[in-house]
């Protein structure tokens, strides 16, 4: 079947990854020892998308866990599902990247890279028909951002025709861990533009807002934030793991979502939003799900989709629901909000429906939008980057690891180009397109 290898890098990547495996294992009824104890053949039908079947009927996640310090690995290993992973797939250094992108990308991370690629190859070789890779990491630290993007380019080099999608946690203004986040994020985005096929931009600020405003949690923990991220990750891959009426896979998603190769940064959303303990006490209708899903409050990136336009979007519904109703609701929402959709891309919303809902819900929906408003997020990082880079603040940490100032300038201009490309397509209209074509023909 179509397998996916999940690589998780750095503290953030591993924490989200570990949580994700808990969610997926629960959906497929795999217990913490790796054995199956479910009652539905659907759970096993495509279990090999994410799991290898080992001897004795054990299921082992196709996960590669990487970090430059042993701490996170220890906590994953001692966590509830720590014994499920293949021990050889834990790869860690001893010294950490110290929030320094250059350490992750050029020095410490590069030394560990060969052993990481060995494990990736081993995982890829045990697949029948490898569909692609998923990478979870944050862009603010050193390991996830620096080493994560290095791994990305190595995978791209070795598996050029496989889809790579990343779940990237972007730094946000309100929730900042380190001063050099803007540097690390800009250098990473520079790499993501070139090497990833699809990037799901998630940021902590939006997750905090969802937790406090929508879920009414008084003090959200990282556990709560990760719960939201995993709901989205699980939703995106549902179609691969369970049968449905309209299926999507990573490649179909990419083909439908990416109108121009550089513009592959999506904002994910999820509905219904529930906190970890209190599952919904009422069943939602398809109409409510659709409404909630397109709501700005449900977006996991801190930018407002109403400030931009949707180039493309995808909605993945889970649960038993009439297809006709889904189609009607999706049509309605596009009809009512037509000004928010790019009019020069007809039928730009893809829908997929999977029959199996997530644990504890009757139905749910995962939303993925390629909206030009995502530029707000990059603009924000870019402004912080410029403010520091003008004064050359903290630069010696990077140049000390052998980096050149030129790289910073390149990364900065690549990110600014991305912002202006989004702006260009936000302003474009169907009529303009025709005029431009005539103009081009005359020039030619």
Swiss-Prot record:
Keywords for this protein: Cytoplasm, Cytoskeleton, GTP-binding, Isopeptide bond, Magnesium, Metal-binding, Microtubule, Nucleotide-binding, Phosphoprotein
GO biological process: microtubule cytoskeleton organization; mitotic cell cycle; oocyte maturation; spindle assembly involved in female meiosis
Cofactors that this protein relies on: Mg(2+)
Keyword Nucleotide-binding in record: yes
Positions annotated to bind Mg(2+): 69
Residues involved in GTP binding: 11, 69, 138, 142-144, 204, 226
SUPFAM superfamilies the UniProt entry points to: Tubulin C-terminal domain-like, Tubulin nucleotide-binding domain-like
Pfam families referenced in this protein's UniProt entry, alphabetically: Tubulin, Tubulin_C
Compositionally biased spans, kind Acidic residues: 429-444
Keyword Metal-binding: yes
Taxonomic superkingdom: Eukaryota
GO molecular function: GTP binding; GTPase activity; metal ion binding; structural constituent of cytoskeleton
Residue list for modification 5-glutamyl polyglutamate: 436
Subunit description: Dimer of alpha and beta chains. A typical microtubule is a hollow water-filled tube with an outer diameter of 25 nm and an inner diameter of 15 nM. Alpha-beta heterodimers associate head-to-tail to form protofilaments running lengthwise along the microtubule wall with the beta-tubulin subunit facing the microtubule plus end conferring a structural polarity. Microtubules usually have 13 protofilaments but different protofilament numbers can be found in some organisms and specialized cells.
Assigned protein family: Belongs to the tubulin family.
Record note on domains: The MREI motif is common among all beta-tubulin isoforms and may be critical for tubulin autoregulation.
The name this protein goes by in its record: Tubulin beta-8 chain
Organism: Pan troglodytes (Chimpanzee)
């Amino acid at each position: 079947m179509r397998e996916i290898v999940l690589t998780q890098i750095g503290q953030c990547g591993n924490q989200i990854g570990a949580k994700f495996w808990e969610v997926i294992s629960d959906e497929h009824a795999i217990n913490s020892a790796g054995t199956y104890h479910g009652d539905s053949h659907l759970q096993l039908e495509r279990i090999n998308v994410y799991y290898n079947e080992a001897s004795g009927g054990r299921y082992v996640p196709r996960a590669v866990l990487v970090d430059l310090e042993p701490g996170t690995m220890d906590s994953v290993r001692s966590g509830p599902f720590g014994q499920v992973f293949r021990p050889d797939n834990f790869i860690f250094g001893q010294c950490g990247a110290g929030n320094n992108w250059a350490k992750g990308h050029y020095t410490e991370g590069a030394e560990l890279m060969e052993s990481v690629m060995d494990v990736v190859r081993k995982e890829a070789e045990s697949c029948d028909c490898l569909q692609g890779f998923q990478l979870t990491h944050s862009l603010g630290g050193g390991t996830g951002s620096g080493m994560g993007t290095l791994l990305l380019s190595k995978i791209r080099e070795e598996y050029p025709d496989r889809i790579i999608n990343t779940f990237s946690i972007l730094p946000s203004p309100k929730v900042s861990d380190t001063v050099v986040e803007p540097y690390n994020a800009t250098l990473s985005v520079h790499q993501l533009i070139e090497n990833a096929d699809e990037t799901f931009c998630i940021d902590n600020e939006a997750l905090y807002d969802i937790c406090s405003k929508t879920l009414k949690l008084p003090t959200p923990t990282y556990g709560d934030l990760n719960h939201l991220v995993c709901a989205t990750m699980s939703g995106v891959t549902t179609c691969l793991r369970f049968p449905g009426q309209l299926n999507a896979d990573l490649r179909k998603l990419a083909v439908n979502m990416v109108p121009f190769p550089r513009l592959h940064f999506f904002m994910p959303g999820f509905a219904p939003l529930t906190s970890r303990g209190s599952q919904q006490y009422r069943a939602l209708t398809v109409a409510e799900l659709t409404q909630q899903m397109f709501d700005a409050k449900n977006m996991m990136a801190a930018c407002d989709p109403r400030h931009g336009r949707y180039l493309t979007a995808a909605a993945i519904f889970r649960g038993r629901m009439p297809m006709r109703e889904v189609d009607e609701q999706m049509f309605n929402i596009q009809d009512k909000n037509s000004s928010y959709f790019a009019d020069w891309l007809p039928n730009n919303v893809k829908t997929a429906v999977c029959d199996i809902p997530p644990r504890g819900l009757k139905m749910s929906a995962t939303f993925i939008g390629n909206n030009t408003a995502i530029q707000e997020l990059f603009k924000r990082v870019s402004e912080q980057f410029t403010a520091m880079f003008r004064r050359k603040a903290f630069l010696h940490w990077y140049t000390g690891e052998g980096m050149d100032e030129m790289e910073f300038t390149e990364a900065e201009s690549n990110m600014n180009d991305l912002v202006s490309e989004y702006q260009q397509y936000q302003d474009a209209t169907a009529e303009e397109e025709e005029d431009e074509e005539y103009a081009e023909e005359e020039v030619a």
